[in-house]
Amino acid sequence: MAEIFESVDKNKDGKILWDEFAEAIRVFSPQITSEEIDKMFIVLDVDGDGQIDDVEFASCLMVNGGGEKDTEEEVVMKEAFDLYDMDGDGKISASEIHVVLKRLGEKHTMEDCVVMVQTVDKDSDGFVNFEEFKIMMNSNKESH
């Protein structure tokens, strides 16, 4: 999670400004509108100061354990899942993770990505489904 934050925080000031956020989102969704980016940014900018700090970034990508459906956090997590699920089949492969991390400037090997999948792949199908993705994001948060 920290690596993703740092890759979006281009000027390395510890805050993600709207322009930095928009640039990162457009890498994956070139046709997204500014209005859609605004909605996502507002969800992440919890304190409303016009910038996203690392705590806001991490906390908003985590789903609260209360089981509420369609919370804003759940929606943001689903949008993040959809970015990784490049072929739209409802599951994420190690190669999809590798491509996304590479686009974000991360230096993970394919083997690293296979291990990421294996770590959370509870049903042993070789892919990460949405529930497993949430576990993966939570474990990333705890390890940073």
Swiss-Prot record:
It holds the Pfam family EF-hand_8. Disulfide bonds: none annotated. Ca(2+) 2 binds at residues 85, 87, 89, 91, 96. Keywords: Calcium, Metal-binding, Repeat. Ca(2+) 1 binds at residues 45, 47, 49, 51, 56. GO terms for molecular function: calcium ion binding. InterPro entries: EF-hand-dom_pair, EF_Hand_1_Ca_BS, EF_hand_dom, EF_hand_pair_protein_CML-like. Residues 1-31, 32-67, 72-107, 108-143 form the EF-hand domain. Ca(2+) 3 binds at residues 121, 123, 125, 132. The keyword Lipid biosynthesis does not apply. Potential calcium sensor. This is Probable calcium-binding protein CML31. It comes from Arabidopsis thaliana (Mouse-ear cress). The gene is CML31.
